[in-house]
Amino acid sequence: MKKTKRIFTALSHLFSPKWWKKNWQRVVFCFFFAVFALLLIFRFVPIPFSAYMVQQKIANLLQGDFRYQIQYNWVSLENISPNIQLAVISSEDQRFLEHLGFDFEAIQRAIRYNEKSNKGIRGASTISQQTAKNLMLWHGQNWLRKGLEVPATMLLELTWSKKRILEVYLNIAEFGNGIFGVEAASRYYFKKSAKNLSQNEAALLAAVLPNPIIYKVNKPSLLVRKKQTWILRQMGNLGTEYLSHL
């Protein structure tokens, strides 16, 4: 009984505003040191799971969906078709090789668009930002998550090459409910390995990013088909030689 009381007392001190006010700098330092150490490790080894996978699993369990399963198969970039590599860059981040994690030109364009348009919010997240968010953070539109995304992206760019960032992005991006990574997506939708994806298949997968819950690969809307066609044009403009600079 005394042991239980001591545990609750320790927890009450840990979560008290006074404790956090006194120790927040130490907590932040330890958090980013741990993130930095993990990024150094994951620079060389396959990623076993991402924070977003864990978030989705827990969310479904809390909703009573015990049948929810994560489909995830890690593959190296050499075993991923250049078509899908080029497709996601064409769709999500055409200045991927030029920026250091943040595309300020895209941010300015998004701000101007959002000020003038009533059609919804346009984002400007780079592949690096999306990778940092999916790997280390949670999804949601709040300032805390957005604030943490900035240093997380900077650490990612500091410790990983562009090639590694793209490799991890392609392996942990969600392409459907519980379907993570291009290998799992390729096998689920097209019954083939990611190594053998055609240009049309790659563009269709990229067209549902970054919101594959609303936009479906297996039931593509007119909007998805239009985006697929646009991605194919952009792939032609970039050219496969773009990937040689990774």
Swiss-Prot record:
Signal peptide (residue range): none
Highest taxon in the source lineage: Bacteria
Catalytic activity: [GlcNAc-(1->4)-Mur2Ac(oyl-L-Ala-gamma-D-Glu-L-Lys-D-Ala-D-Ala)](n)-di-trans,octa-cis-undecaprenyl diphosphate + beta-D-GlcNAc-(1->4)-Mur2Ac(oyl-L-Ala-gamma-D-Glu-L-Lys-D-Ala-D-Ala)-di-trans,octa-cis-undecaprenyl diphosphate = [GlcNAc-(1->4)-Mur2Ac(oyl-L-Ala-gamma-D-Glu-L-Lys-D-Ala-D-Ala)](n+1)-di-trans,octa-cis-undecaprenyl diphosphate + di-trans,octa-cis-undecaprenyl diphosphate + H(+)
Pathway membership: Cell wall biogenesis; peptidoglycan biosynthesis
Principal location listed in the UniProt entry: membrane
Gene Ontology terms for molecular function: pentosyltransferase activity; peptidoglycan glycosyltransferase activity
Membrane topology, from the record: Single-pass membrane protein
Transmembrane helix found in the keyword field: yes
One Gene Ontology CC term in the entry: peptidoglycan-based cell wall
Keyword Metal-binding: no
Pfam family, one: Transgly
PANTHER family per record: BIOSYNTHETIC PEPTIDOGLYCAN TRANSGLYCOSYLASE (PTHR30400:SF0), MONOFUNCTIONAL BIOSYNTHETIC PEPTIDOGLYCAN TRANSGLYCOSYLASE (PTHR30400)
Protein name: Biosynthetic peptidoglycan transglycosylase
